[in-house]
Swiss-Prot record:
<protein>
    <recommendedName>
        <fullName>Conotoxin mr5.3</fullName>
    </recommendedName>
</protein>
<keyword id="KW-1015">Disulfide bond</keyword>
<keyword id="KW-0964">Secreted</keyword>
<keyword id="KW-0800">Toxin</keyword>
<comment type="similarity">
    <text>Belongs to the conotoxin T superfamily.</text>
</comment>
<keyword id="KW-0732">Signal</keyword>
<keyword id="KW-0301">Gamma-carboxyglutamic acid</keyword>
<dbReference type="GO" id="GO:0090729">
    <property type="term" value="F:toxin activity"/>
</dbReference>
<feature type="signal peptide">
    <location>
        <begin position="1"/>
        <end position="19"/>
    </location>
</feature>
<keyword id="KW-0165">Cleavage on pair of basic residues</keyword>
<dbReference type="Pfam" id="PF16981">
    <property type="entry name" value="Chi-conotoxin"/>
</dbReference>
<feature type="propeptide">
    <location>
        <begin position="20"/>
        <end position="48"/>
    </location>
</feature>
<dbReference type="InterPro" id="IPR031565">
    <property type="entry name" value="T-conotoxin"/>
</dbReference>
<dbReference type="GO" id="GO:0005576">
    <property type="term" value="C:extracellular region"/>
</dbReference>
<feature type="modified residue" description="4-carboxyglutamate">
    <location>
        <position position="60"/>
    </location>
</feature>
<feature type="modified residue" description="4-carboxyglutamate">
    <location>
        <position position="56"/>
    </location>
</feature>
Length: 64
């Protein structure tokens, strides 16, 4: 019966160890853009292309 508490403690310690996916960031790591930002950017490009075909004066390629 003495082994049961030791076994439980070992299980708790193993569960609290960070997984392989938890890696430290380096200075070269860039945060990934969210899917919302990607959709917004794509819609902006398509809107500008459609606008340029119809009215050349409204052509803007100002992507932020």
């Amino acid at each position: 019966m003495r082994c049961v508490p030791v076994f439980v403690i070992l299980l708790l310690l193993i569960a609290s160890v960070p997984s392989v996916d938890a890696q430290l960031k380096t200075k070269d790591d860039m945060p990934l853009a969210s899917s919302h930002a990607n959709v917004k950017r794509t819609l902006q490009i398509l809107r500008n292309k459609r606008c340029c075909i119809t009215f050349e004066s409204c052509c803007e390629f100002d992507l932020k």
